[in-house]
Structure formats: structure tokens, C-alpha cells
Amino acid sequence: MLTLSDFDFPLPPELIAQSALPDRSASRLLVVERLAPGDTADAVHMADRAFSDIVDYLRPDDLLVFNDTRVIKARFFGHKPSGGKVEVLVERVLDTHTVLAQVRASKTPVEGSALHLADDAFAVTVGPRVDQFFTLRFPEPALDLIERYGRLPLPPYITHDPDAYDETRYQTVYARSPGAVAAPTAGLHFDDALFARLDAAGVRRAFLTLHVGAGTFQPVRTENLAEHKMHSEWYAISEDLAQAVRETRARGGRVIAVGTTSLRALESAAQPDGTLAAGSGDTDIFITPGYRFRLVDALITNFHLPKSTLLMLVSALAGVQAIRAAYRHAVEQRYRFFSYGDAMLLTRQPDAAAA
């Protein structure tokens, strides 16, 4: 049985990308090509390419599925009426005026009290707790105040304060549905010029929405993976996407998830017969080696943190030994890691397909 320690690997800190490249598609791409069935390092071949070369590895009638969520300026600093400092990170917008949020303070805020945010620009009212989160009520539409006064919530491993460059580069060019507190980072490598080349090659694309929560950075704290409680995120699948999947299957194309968030949404809505159900809801799907994929054939993804649930996910798709070999190669070749880093193209190992 695999344990948390099986997903650890040494990572020199200087390989953690601290800023995005000026040219989105100029990042590097590690292509992990499957040569044979079985989960061994010898069963795959690795090719070091530029991300813009991904067109060479896609086929006419392949379907790329993107997550169109938009990162909101979810972080606030402020104070309690007593003067004590608080930090608020919005996790989810519940309705026009209400959000779920993490609140950091020296003492737990009291239900009914006020938190004064953004240099006293406005105050929110503390509501009931929901697990580790607080409900907060905004005096005006929450998304308006978030956009006006909030700060971009860069991941904890990026050490600089967010600036105007981050506000552009920590969004995909197709982001349109506000609600995420972390970017679907595999999509950061795509630009309009690359989309034009994909169109010319006959590669199709479609979109879903999954609002990425801060739980994506939540560490796994138990060696026994079965004891880990996965965070929940809201997603929506349109009938247009469900139809695009049906057409792709009929034409013999592959369903390729752009990012782990797209993959998690697709697999959450996948039916036993391999079709995709339109609709919306919450997912806390936790994909680990041994999972049988119903829908996704391949994945475009960045490099993930040691011992993370996302490293477990890519290991389930491509194979534990294949991913170990790929990550060793990436470290040796000085790839850039995490949100602003480089990418991989992974194909599903045959043993991971649903019967």
C-alpha cells in the first residue's frame, strides 16, 4: 500500500518559479510518452520541448478541456474593533453578499462582530463557522468589493507581494467566471497565437468551470492516504461540453484535460459508460494510484509539490514509477516548478482505464 512518503522527492528551492515568463508559451514542456504498458520507468520516453511545440503531440479531433475560472482578489488585511490585526482569505462566494473565508487573528472572531478591512474601506459581519471557515457578510456585492479592494492571493511558495504583472499573468487569457482563489495554472501557458495554431491543426477546445479553492495548497498530514479529507470545490459542466465529448469519442479523438482542476471536474461528472453528465455541484474527488479513469485520456499539467494530492493524481494517471522518473529528470534538467513553472504532457497508462 502506498503511503504519503512514497510521494516525496527532493526539490532544490531555486527551481520554484517566482515569476511568470513574459511569453506564455515560451515555457518548457516535458513530454512523457508511453512506449509500453506497465508502470516502470522503462515504459516511458521523455522529450524536452518548448510548450509551443505541444501542437506536435496533438491530433485532429483531440478535445482540449479548459477551466475558465477567474482568480478573484481574495486576500484582505484589516483589524477587529479591538484593534487586533486580521487576515481574511475568501474561499468561496456563497451569494451576492456572503462568502466563506479563512480568518487569521490572535483570537477567534465572535459571531456578529465586525472586521474592518482594506484600510477601513468597509467592514464585514462575522457569521457562523463552517468547519475551518467563517461566513462573512459584505455590505455591498462581495465580488465588487473584492475586485476593488482585495489583493491577488498568490500561492504561499511565491515570496513577493502581488503586483500589476501578477494580476495579468496569474490569470489565463480565457478566464471569465470569477470565483477561484488559485489559478488553474496549466492554462497559463496558452495564448491567442497558440490557440490559432491549434485551430489550424484541427484540435478542438471546450470549457468547464471549477472554482479552485485554497485547499489546493492544503498539505496531506497523514501517512495513510485513506485518512486524508479532501477539500470541496464547486464545478459546472455545460451541455455544450458534454456534447463535445460525445462528438470527440465518435470521431476517435482524445479527451485531454488542461490542468488537474479540469481533470477532477471531468472525472467527477463522468458516467460509468464513459459519457459526461452536464450539471453543477461540489466535488471532493481524491484521485490516487489505483483509480480507474472513466473519461480523461491525457493531461497537461504543471509540476506539483512533494507529498501533494496533485502529485498523487498525476501518478494515478501516468504511473507512480513513470512520474518518479519524470520528476527526477525535471530536477536534473532544471525545469521550473509549481504555479509559474513549466509543464508536462502525460498520457494515461493503459492499466488506469475504467473497464
Swiss-Prot record:
GO cellular component: a single term: cytoplasm
Pfam family, one: Queuosine_synth
Enzyme Commission code: 2.4.99.17
Swiss-Prot/TrEMBL GO biological process terms: queuosine biosynthetic process; tRNA wobble guanine modification
Chief subcellular location: cytoplasm
Gene3D superfamilies: QueA-like
HAMAP family hit by this protein: QueA
Designated name of the protein: S-adenosylmethionine:tRNA ribosyltransferase-isomerase
